[in-house]
Amino acid sequence: MSQITMRQMIEAGVHFGHQTRFWNPKMAQYIFGARNKIHIVNLEKTLPMFQDAQEAVRRLVANKGTVLFVGTKRQARDIIREEATRAGMPFVDYRWLGGMLTNYKTVKQSIKRLEEKTAALENAAESGFSKKEILEMQRDVEKLERSLGGIKNMKGLPDAIFVIDTGYQKGTLVETEKLGIPVIAVVDTNNSPDGVKYVIPGNDDSAKAIRLYCRGIADAVLEGKNQALQETVAAAQEAAAE
């Protein structure tokens, strides 16, 4: 698993919180102090908490669990998509649709519609559709793909969710709380850690910091998958030897 160091966190600006006037007192225990009216996050707390989050992800995935990556703010979108894809995990990078988890049956129907429209589009020219009709079909598919493309291969509700910016993803946390799905989240000094099982106190605005978190969690996923594979191979070899 990638060992993130204190130096890497400092270089990525993980320690820079929000302006002191916007702080959430519930984050006081993770704040080292303030500089130029900006809160400084205590990285001596962040680093071990991030490692705990990585270990939790590794264990969960080693047991065949699924982690949903969520980050829909502008500076997180591309990174969330890239790292979740690298790890082979589902993601939401465009917009959190209300009921994405609590009304999952309806979401599954929308995913089915996306699959049907995609299949129809592939054969549209042969089926005699006009250029205008094909263009409309493309727009429909692109719209659905933007919202649902990252979760279209998800087999059911995720076992955990990894979130960038709990303030931005309030709707996500409401749904995870209702369903009892554990949350791993980056929580900045202006947000509340309530409802988050694995809190990662730190900067949730810097693309460098977001990349560091996402890469670390994706690496933990890949290590968990590798462990699961090794255990499967060992079990098969043991069975063959009997």
UniProtKB/Swiss-Prot annotation:
GO-annotated biological processes: translation
Protein name, UniProt field: Small ribosomal subunit protein uS2
Keyword Lipid metabolism included in the entry's annotation: no
Pfam family, one: Ribosomal_S2
Family annotation (InterPro entries): Ribosomal_uS2, Ribosomal_uS2_bac/mit/plastid, Ribosomal_uS2_CS, Ribosomal_uS2_flav_dom_sf
Statement: the UniProt record of this protein carries the keyword Secreted: no
Similarity annotation: Belongs to the universal ribosomal protein uS2 family.
Top-rank lineage group of the source organism: Bacteria
Gene: rpsB
Organism from which the protein derives: Neisseria meningitidis serogroup C (strain 053442)
UniProt keywords, alphabetically: Ribonucleoprotein, Ribosomal protein
A GO MF term: structural constituent of ribosome
Any one GO CC term of the record: cytosolic small ribosomal subunit
Stored NCBIfam families: rpsB_bact
